[in-house]
Amino acid sequence: MEHKFVFIALAGALGTLARYSLAGFVQQFNSSFFPFGTLVVNITGCFAAGFLWTLFESRWAVSGEVRTFVLVGFMGAFTTFSAFILETGMLVRSTEWIYGIVNLLLQNSLGFGALMAGIVLGRLI
């Protein structure tokens, strides 16, 4: 069991480096304040998570450990947004689409609310 944590941590380190590299590469071509690098990372991560999940489910015979390494470790560190969208997609795919919509609404509204609360609290301190 302990080796699983080491592999997830290693995959997470690789995902973090990939995120930093891609976001920085994209952002260097952008002169505005809009975070295009993060946008590209998040959308790329969502695409990759869906693509790999589908291949793992239907085309490639990979172990649970490999799935965890790639989807939880690498993709989780590359962008947690991809994990959120993947989980929402799994809900919709399993015919729990109401929960998928609720997840979308809650994650976005509560996430933004928490961000704003953090900003307000940070300004008060």
UniProtKB/Swiss-Prot annotation:
Record InterPro entries: FluC (IPR003691)
Regions that span the bilayer: 5-25, 33-53, 69-89, 101-121
Residues engaged in binding Na(+): G76, T79
Record-level GO BP terms: cellular detoxification of fluoride
Main location per the UniProt record: membrane
GO cellular component: plasma membrane
Function comment: Fluoride-specific ion channel. Important for reducing fluoride concentration in the cell, thus reducing its toxicity.
Family: Belongs to the fluoride channel Fluc/FEX (TC 1.A.43) family.
PANTHER family associated with the record: FLUORIDE EXPORT PROTEIN 1-RELATED
Protein name, entry field: Fluoride-specific ion channel FluC
Protein's organism: Desulforapulum autotrophicum (strain ATCC 43914 / DSM 3382 / VKM B-1955 / HRM2) (Desulfobacterium autotrophicum)
Gene: fluC
